[in-house]
Amino acid sequence: MDVQEPPNFSTGLVAELHAPLRSAGVPDPEPYAAFIAASGEPALELGCGQGDPLLALRARGLDVEGLDASADRLARLRLRAEADGVEVVVHHSTIEAMELRRRYQSIFLAGPTFNLLPDDDTAWHALDRIRAHLEPGGAALVPLFIPERTPRSTFGVARTHITADGTEMRVTAVSETRDVAQRLQVTVLRYELIGSDGGVDRVERPWVLHWHTQDGFRSLAEEAGLTVSTVLRPDGRPAEPDDTTFAFRLTPDPAWDRPRTSRPTGGGAMMAAAMFGLEQAIFGERPKVQVVAEAEADGLDRGDIELDLDDPARSRITIQEEE
């Protein structure tokens, strides 16, 4: 199955309608507060979205930062934080490309956001970045699930929310494909905003879910230099092999020395970082953006990619050979 996913699912209208239409409710901050208490501060929430549970954890005085790939969702988070009088530090990046100056005792995802990474290569790069941002002795919490098919009876049936001024918000499952061999399910969702004047804004996005078996994810984590300490059910009990919802607690392997040949991508990581930078430039966040990423191909060390949309002729890609 070939998937052409937009740069980020949660942009524009989707970001606007996500919170009112979400079916899972607001994440309970308690499990994540307990994880931070056990693993230590500072902490980092990956895929923090519009601020749940990040802002609740910050309101408790915990040293927690956030990271998300959607600038639109982060903008909404900042507005909420300002309204609530909560100071918060957030970073705009994908997980697999993050290069932060700080290291953390605790890194976590509040829900199975990791399933949104579309393939094993991207997941490996994300785990590699998680390991690189953990302090020695720190821990990461990665919830995962194996999705079921969307019931046929729900296709074409909208989930709705009506605001006080009569505006109607809708999300509808339009179609779905599932590839068990690739562990990939793609559901096309239609988001609609219907104003009280009858005007309609509409967008369709592919919701890509890539799932992992427990054994497969364990191997992937170990390839990225992480050790599995526990695999738990949502209720905190040890996961059984046939469970479809589980969370991995990972710690950095102190003896791990990353081989140059692990997960070779022929520069794919660098290109992913470049495309992320290009997205930001196109949407006007930075007229000129420089992205530095690691190239995994043999014989390559680091590369500089500089994109200048004001003068494309000045854009450049420089690859440095290993010393």
Where are these regions (language model features)?
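Conserved class I S-adenosyl-L-methionine
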Residues: 1-41, 52
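Class I SAM-dependent methyltransferase SAM/SAH-binding core
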Residues: 52-97
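C-terminal lobe and adjacent flexible extensions of AdoMet/dcAdoMet transferase-like proteins
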Residues: 208-252
